[in-house]
């Protein structure tokens, strides 16, 4: 069996990706018609990716990226424009046009993380001696591509974020039909009536299993392949970004923007697998 080609970790904006981002900048953040010419935004975007990967403080960014205070100002400006979510949506849309989004099977799960600096949307983490933390709730397609992500205090139960997560898909979700149903896989944290009602309301077929409760046939084999693991795999990949592993941002919207950027980069990797090139 041929192995899937692997691509290096994205540390800077490729030419292809920059063309997509530049088009979005022209639409949502065009330069002013008067005043001094605007500085090149590409090094600034590279700096934001570097910070996402390393988790360094803004004032510790390498000098090659330019003035750190200017980089931070531009980042804050883009956060207010929801620009990182727009990049995510644009890349997901391109993948969908290439039939690279697997809507039939989806999965959702939550992920707890530390929040060192305080701020909004934090709460006592029940798995970390009640220290401050933030919860992320993620929805993925059938192979782990992120479709939506929301954040909340760490002490909010997963199932209480389910409806917000399903409402936050960054592109229009195809309407499920009897011929083309959509399935949603959830773990035991969603094994309650409220979650089942939400799943039904959003026209999914629910697959909520307790640990060790997978269906088996007469020979003791699983009837259906495990599908929930894809969201756990994506959460594990996101935790490799040191800027996401521990939240240092006091403003939740700044932390969410970095999560959105990481999700966008995952779709870009799928896009280059589909077209077979990266520059």
Question: Regions from the language model: what does each represent?
Answer:
Residues 1-279:
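Short alpha-helical elements
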């Amino acid at each position: 069996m041929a192995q899937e080609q692997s691509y290096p970790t994205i540390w800077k904006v490729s030419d292809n990706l920059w063309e997509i981002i530049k088009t979005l900048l022209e639409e949502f953040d065009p330069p002013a018609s008067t005043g001094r010419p605007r500085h090149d935004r590409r090094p600034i975007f590279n700096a934001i990716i570097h910070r996402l990967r390393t988790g360094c403080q803004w004032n510790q960014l390498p000098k090659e990226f330019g003035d750190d205070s200017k980089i931070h100002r531009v980042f804050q400006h883009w956060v207010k424009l929801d620009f990182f979510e727009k990049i995510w949506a644009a890349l997901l849309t391109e993948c969908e046009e290439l039939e690279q989004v697997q809507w039939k099977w989806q999965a959702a799960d939550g992920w707890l993380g530390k929040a060192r600096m305080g701020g909004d949307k934090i709460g006592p983490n029940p798995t970390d001696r009640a220290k401050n933390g933030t919860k992320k709730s993620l929805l993925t397609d059938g192979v782990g591509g992120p479709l939506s992500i929301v954040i909340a205090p760490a002490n909010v139960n997963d199932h209480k974020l389910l409806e917000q997560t399903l409402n936050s898909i960054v592109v229009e979700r195809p309407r499920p039909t009897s011929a083309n149903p959509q399935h949603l896989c959830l773990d035991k944290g969603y094994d309650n009536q409220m979650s089942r009602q939400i799943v039904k309301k959003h026209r999914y077929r629910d697959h909520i299993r307790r640990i060790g409760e997978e269906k088996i046939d007469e020979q003791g084999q699983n009837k259906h392949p495990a599908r929930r693991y894809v969201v756990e795999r994506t959460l594990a990949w996101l935790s490799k970004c040191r800027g996401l592993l521990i939240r240092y941002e006091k403003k939740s919207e700044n932390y969410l923007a970095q999560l959105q950027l990481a999700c966008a980069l995952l779709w870009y990797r799928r896009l280059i697998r589909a077209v077979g090139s990266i520059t």
